[in-house]
Amino acid sequence: MSRKCPLTGKRPRRGNSYTIRGIAKKKKGIGLKVTGKTPRRFFPNMITKRLWSTEENKFLKLKISTSALRLIDKLGLEKVIARAKSKGL
C-alpha cells in the first residue's frame, strides 16, 4: 500500500534532520551550532480503520491519515468520500 491518504491526499514530505552541539545561551553558553544536516522524510500519520458506510450498508476498510479521521467525525464519511472523488483523489 502507498503512504498516500486517499481522502486528504497527504503524502510523505521531504526535509532535513539537523545535528546540533554547544551550550544554549540560556545556560550561559555561546549558543547552539548546526554541525550536520541529513535528508529525511516526514510521513503522514496513517492508520487502518474499519468505517461503516450507510449508503453501501457495509464496513469499508480504509488506510487513512488521522486528519482524515477527524474530517470524517466532523462531516461524515459519505461527504468526505464525495469530496475526495470530486478532487480526483
Curated annotation (Swiss-Prot):
One of its GO terms (biological process) is translation. GO terms for cellular component: ribonucleoprotein complex; ribosome. Keywords: Ribonucleoprotein, Ribosomal protein. GO terms for molecular function: structural constituent of ribosome. Pfam families: Ribosomal_L28. Belongs to the bacterial ribosomal protein bL28 family. This is Large ribosomal subunit protein bL28. It comes from Chlamydia caviae (strain ATCC VR-813 / DSM 19441 / 03DC25 / GPIC).
